[in-house]
C-alpha cells in the first residue's frame, strides 16, 4: 500500500526548536516524529511512501538516507518554490498514485494509536472518495457530518463561519485528526498545480461524492505541532 506524509511545514509554533531543524525531525521521547509516523505506516502494511518537503528539506533527505529509507521505497516531493497547502501539495504528488488504489495521507505531526487497517477497510466498505479520521474533542474548527457519517459541512468556531449542505437534518461536529484515506479519483476534481486547501475540495465534492467520517474516540492522539502537546506526548511515551 502507498501513503503520503505531509512534512513540508515550517513548524512555526515549535520555534525556537525549528530554527535549526525541520518540524519532521523534532523528537518525541528521543525519536523524530517522522520516524514514528513512518514506522506506524509500515506496521499498517504501507511499503511505499512519498513525503513533501520545504523547510530544511536537506535535513530530512539526509535523515532518510542515514536510515536506509527504513527498508521501503520513499520518494520526495519538493516544494522549494513555496508551500502549496494541503491540496496543492497532494496534487503535486499525484504522479505517485497512478495505480488507482486508495492510499493513506498522514500529517507528520500527528501521533495516534488509530487502527489504520480498520480505517482502510471502512473506507473500502463505504466506497468513499475520501475517509477522514475524526474525534470528539474541543477544536476551533469542525467538520460537519450527517447521521450516515457523510461530510456535509464545516464550521469555524472563532469566526462563526459555517458551511452546511444539509441544513434541515441533524448534524454532528467532529474534529479532524490529520489522517485521511483517499482514492486517486479525487485528482480528477482538483485544480491544477497551484496552492489550495484539500478541505475546500472535500466540501465542494461532498454533495455528489461520499466523503466519510471514521470516528476514533478511544486511545491516544496528539497534534505535536504545538509546544504543550509535544510536552504531553513526551511524557506519555516516556511512561509507555
Say what each PLM segment does.
Residues 1-19, 44:
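N-terminal nucleotide-binding beta1-loop-alpha1 segment
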Residues 2-5, 31-107, 118, 192-193:
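Conserved N-terminal catalytic core of the sugar/cofactor nucleotidyltransferase
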Residues 3, 25, 76-77, 130, ...:
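Generic preference for hydrophobic
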Residues 20-33:
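Short catalytic helix/loop segments, enriched in acidic residues and glycine
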Residues 103-104, 111, 117-124, 137-138, ...:
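Catalytic-core segments of class I nucleotidyltransferases/pyrophosphorylases
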Residues 126-136:
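A short, conserved acidic/glycine-rich loop-to-beta-strand motif
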Residues 144-146:
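Short beta-strand-to-turn element immediately C-terminal to the catalytic PLP-Schiff-base lysine
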Amino acid at each position: 500500500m502507498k501513503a503520503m506524509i505531509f512534512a513540508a511545514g515550517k513548524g512555526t509554533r515549535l520555534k525556537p526548536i525549528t530554527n535549526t531543524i525541520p518540524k519532521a525531525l523534532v523528537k518525541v521521547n528521543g525519536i523524530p516524529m517522522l520516524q514514528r509516523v513512518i514506522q506506524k505506516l509500515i506496521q499498517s502494511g504501507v511499503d511505499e511512501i512519498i513525503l513533501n518537503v520545504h523547510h530544511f528539506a536537506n535535513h530530512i533527505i539526509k535523515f532518510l538516507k542515514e536510515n536506509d529509507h527504513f527498508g521501503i521505497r520513499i520518494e520526495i516531493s519538493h516544494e522549494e518554490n513555496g508551500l502549496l497547502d494541503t491540496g496543492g501539495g497532494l496534487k503535486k504528488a499525484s504522479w505517485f498514485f497512478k495505480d488507482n488504489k486508495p492510499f493513506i495521507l498522514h500529517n507528520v505531526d500527528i501521533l495516534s494509536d488509530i487502527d489504520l487497517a480498520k480505517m482502510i477497510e471502512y473506507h473500502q466498505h463505504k466506497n468513499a472518495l475520501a475517509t477522514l479520521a475524526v474525534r470528539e474533542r474541543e477544536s476551533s474548527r469542525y467538520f460537519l457530518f450527517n447521521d450516515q457519517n457523510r461530510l456535509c459541512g464545516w464550521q469555524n468556531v472563532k469566526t462563526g463561519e459555517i458551511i452546511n449542505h444539509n441544513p434541515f437534518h441533524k448534524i454532528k461536529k467532529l474534529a479532524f485528526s490529520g489522517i485521511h484515506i483517499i482514492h486517486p479519483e479525487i485528482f480528477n476534481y482538483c485544480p491544477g498545480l497551484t496552492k489550495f486547501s484539500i478541505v475546500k475540495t472535500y466540501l465542494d465534492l461532498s454533495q455528489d461524492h461520499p466523503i466519510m467520517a471514521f470516528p476514533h474516540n478511544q486511545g491516544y492522539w496528539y497534534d505535536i505541532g504545538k509546544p504543550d502537546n509535544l510536552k504531553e506526548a513526551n511524557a506519555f511515551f516516556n511512561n509507555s
